[in-house]
Amino acid sequence: MHRVAQAIVEEKTRVIDVDLRSYFDNVQHALLLKKVGRRVQDTAVMHLLKMILKATGKKGVPQGGVVSPLLSNVYLTEVDRMLERAITTTRRGKYTHVQYARFADDLVILIDSHPRQDWLVKAVEKRLREELAKLGVEINEEKSRMVDLTKGDSFSFLGFEYRRILSRNKVWRPQYVPRLKKRTALLAKLREIFRRYVSQPVERVIELINPILRGWVNYFAVGHSSRCFSFVKDWVDKKIRRHLMRARQRSGFGWNRWSRQWLYEKLGLFNQYQLLRREPPSKAQPTGSVS
């Protein structure tokens, strides 16, 4: 995430938001095994890997498996190398005109906004298609798009929604928050637990929802998630209060009956919604400049 944020600070505001068509279903086993075999010499490990892949036929990586993210990353290493070369060959001193970030099939490429780099957008896109074609992977034309952050557009990467905002100091800064669909999915999962365990003691409900909340918050704590966290916290608070009141066959939320402190300290409801603070990215200084 920091790599993307840094690129936005450096005015790489033209973003190729890449969506790969049915990526996990189209990983070619022969190519994948060849790539893994260059690094793994253990025959037992290679045999186990073949057995795992065999379950999906002649191509595809089983989603949800322990090794699936690793295999999905390994398969696109040539794409990484191509983009790293693009960064190196277009570098001018300390400043780069291209940056990218990828995890498995989630890929974004950020390019300098200056008109002199218009050619670079087409060149990178062309080379990307060439490398993907060698791997039997296609770009989903309907979902892939070119984003211009200077026009207020946004793009998503690894569950975060990125955009560029003007700070109080009149400096353009990146902002990345949890995507709305991620928050919606979280609340749907929690709502199902409240529904399924409506007649169970509140302690049992909290025992089930706390690990879900902890994992979700820990993941999104690196972003500008305070407003989203406040929404989730209030939503869970109300759900717990309704559960308690329903058990007493009463309406309302029991605002005067139970304090928030009681919910967190007495019942043990998850309450660690703190953000992980880190130094904001700064613009790279070109070679020879005075810092």
Task: Name each model-derived stretch.
Residues 100-103, 142-152, 209-212, 229-237, ...:
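A glycine-rich phosphate-binding loop feature that marks nucleotide/adenosyl-phosphate handling sites
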Residues 59-63, 191-205, 216-228, 245-249:
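Short, solvent-exposed helix-loop connector elements
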Residues 54, 72, 76-80, 84, ...:
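Amphipathic alpha-helical core segments of compact helical bundles
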Residues 2-149, 154:
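Conserved polymerase palm-domain catalytic core
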